[in-house]
């Protein structure tokens, strides 16, 4: 007699199995009845979830619901051959848990080869299931066929290990279990090695980090697969994957079991919610769904903490902890399975630690209990002994179990404070060990303010990493400046670093620079207070402590100045130099700034930003060495640039007379805003016959060898729409404007200088000449008759741009020295943005003098130096009119 042995928990609130079977037997339309029960049951479970029932409660109920449908359908279609086929749930469904749109995989296990009766029964059964609305994967095999397929396929043996009998002969199912046992195929050693390699490949696919901005809840590092990995390997070795049973095997501790169950429940909750939200199988936590999922799961904005940021922080912390447990437990299993017969080589390190086969371990399990400072010492030893490959899993477990010993008394101990500073002063392994300290929870325990930023993300497209990961990446970048093998990466940074007498001060500034993120208020000022307190508490001199605090307080100063101010202006340099104060601060700030930008987003750093910072550093260094009481005279600065450019041009064959004529036609500010090298290049256009025919003179060249970045110089008759048409054309050419400088001459001409970058794919070197020619020709055509240039039609808007919308803000300040208005615009980085702004400027008869374009992911912060038709700063009325015009054009 066939048996129903599905072991998921029955739920009489969905329906009662015996009565359900009776209804099926007496129904004239069992298909309609099953379809109706399935639909109603799924809706019932969905409503329970939306009203607060946990995913952990619903997953077995969902599996049980599907069990009933399958069992009744199988019973109906195998009446003629009940002893010859068993219905088996496999894979994730076999575990007895099912998400709303997860795969439903079944195996029809046969006693023998099929005949026509069995074949017809199976065919009708499968068709019937599809008609009920179930989407399944199925296979039909004998026990021998299952064994052979499993022998050759890691995924299939894993799927069969999770098999669960739903309906049919128990003996047949037991024969399958015997056939795939470790004694027959895939012993625990073979299985461990194969699954270990599989996990490494899977993690590589997700960049080996749990901190992806759009993580995969199932497959990503720290996801559900990492928990299942522990269970699969345990099943092959211990013949159980129950966390309770693994506790009895002394493989898991009570706290580890609790952590695994909590992580699993949280990840289940997210995945169940994601399936419910999207109405399909979706395991990727895309930006599209993060806000809605946070709301669905009951998160609310709390002060500076957005609901979505709280959700993602919980996810990252859970995933990171799951990853740590996965790594530690697999290492413990590796020692039991692979290294049980390995030759042991033990080398003493000191009275507390020894190296066993290349891994550091405690000599006595009570080391941390009796000597809590060893919780820091372990990381110092790893720095001092580079031959040691890592920490043994048993010692990692002890570290985790004794983290609670790092309390106020521990932090107040002068020996422990000295140990921490010794770690920061080492010549090697600083980044690696800080990351390991973070991984084991020691860094957050010793620095509670750091613990608060672990897993904290910012919901934008600018910050690619969580705050803690970004911080450690910044320190990694600082360390690269110290290493000769990376000297060619950023030569100036490497050169300056050699002059830093106490690198630990830089590392501390990096550690604290974002430590106050998420508290509300100015994180730079708040972090500076934390840094000063920490440094003084850890025995640093008052002078060194103040330097670290100053760096934290001003860590954005240099990048903001370089990217939003006209650093060709000596007055800007003078103001910046006064804020910095001395060359020691300048050196530290420059290194911190470069490392910070490079650690924020892999796409943020380029040679253009490198050149800007380099230029600001060099000019400020010169101002400081000259003395702040002797500022650079603007006229003298212009004369120096003219003379340097003149000498180069004379060597090129130009005459003094010709250069004097050219110089007289150009406003003095032109020489302030351009380098001698740029002037030398521009002369090619300026020396040509003046464009009275309406055709502009245009030059295009590659900029600083940066892939995809170019310089464009335009010499044309002044026209109200000239800048609007230029920026519109660049948008149509898929060029992003990084920098723009505009000079109007006294005889009715305009000089436009741009640094632009390919918005899309960087082109191959072979295509560059064609691309430069294309840009030149299209700009020439459009600017010859600006009035007839085609209107801009925005193209495809990327998905992420639509998701991250920021409020538009416009502020005006007066630059009295240069008699212009500085307008700062913060808004979304829509395609053609600059063209729209320029149309607004033209409509208000506002003249653009200079522009600094800064893109922060999907947000831009653009600074425009503007004046009215009288070359004066805008009046309050003109500012309001322009603001309204910009809002109007941005909304179109």
UniProtKB/Swiss-Prot annotation:
GO MF: [protein-PII] uridylyltransferase activity; phosphoric diester hydrolase activity
Superkingdom field: Bacteria
Single GO BP term: regulation of nitrogen utilization
InterPro entries tied to this protein: ACT-like_dom_sf, ACT_dom, HD/PDEase_dom, HD_domain, NT_sf, PII_UdlTrfase/GS_AdlTrfase, Polymerase_NTP_transf_dom, UTase/UR
Gene3D superfamilies linked: Beta Polymerase, domain 2, cca-adding enzyme, domain 2
UniProtKB keywords: Hydrolase, Magnesium, Multifunctional enzyme, Nucleotidyltransferase, Repeat, Transferase
EC number of the protein: 2.7.7.59, 3.1.4.-
The keyword Translocase belongs to this UniProt entry's keyword annotation: no
Cofactor: Mg(2+)
Catalytic activity from the UniProt record: [protein-PII]-L-tyrosine + UTP = [protein-PII]-uridylyl-L-tyrosine + diphosphate; [protein-PII]-uridylyl-L-tyrosine + H2O = [protein-PII]-L-tyrosine + UMP + H(+)
Keyword Hydrolase: yes
Region feature Uridylyl-removing, mapped onto this chain: 349-710
Stretches the record annotates as Uridylyltransferase: 1-348
UniProt activity-regulation remark: Uridylyltransferase (UTase) activity is inhibited by glutamine, while glutamine activates uridylyl-removing (UR) activity.
Matches recorded under CDD domains: ACT_ACR-UUR-like_2, ACT_UUR-like_1, HDc, NT_GlnE_GlnD_like
Domain ACT: 711-786, 822-892
Function: Modifies, by uridylylation and deuridylylation, the PII regulatory proteins (GlnB and homologs), in response to the nitrogen status of the cell that GlnD senses through the glutamine level. Under low glutamine levels, catalyzes the conversion of the PII proteins and UTP to PII-UMP and PPi, while under higher glutamine levels, GlnD hydrolyzes PII-UMP to PII and UMP (deuridylylation). Thus, controls uridylylation state and activity of the PII proteins, and plays an important role in the regulation of nitrogen assimilation and metabolism.
Family stated for the protein in its record: Belongs to the GlnD family.
UniProt cross-references to HAMAP family, sorted A to Z: PII_uridylyl_transf (MF_00277)
Domain characteristics, as noted in the entry: Has four distinct domains: an N-terminal nucleotidyltransferase (NT) domain responsible for UTase activity, a central HD domain that encodes UR activity, and two C-terminal ACT domains that seem to have a role in glutamine sensing.
UniProt-recorded name of the protein: Bifunctional uridylyltransferase/uridylyl-removing enzyme
Native organism: Nitrosococcus oceani (strain ATCC 19707 / BCRC 17464 / JCM 30415 / NCIMB 11848 / C-107)
Gene: glnD
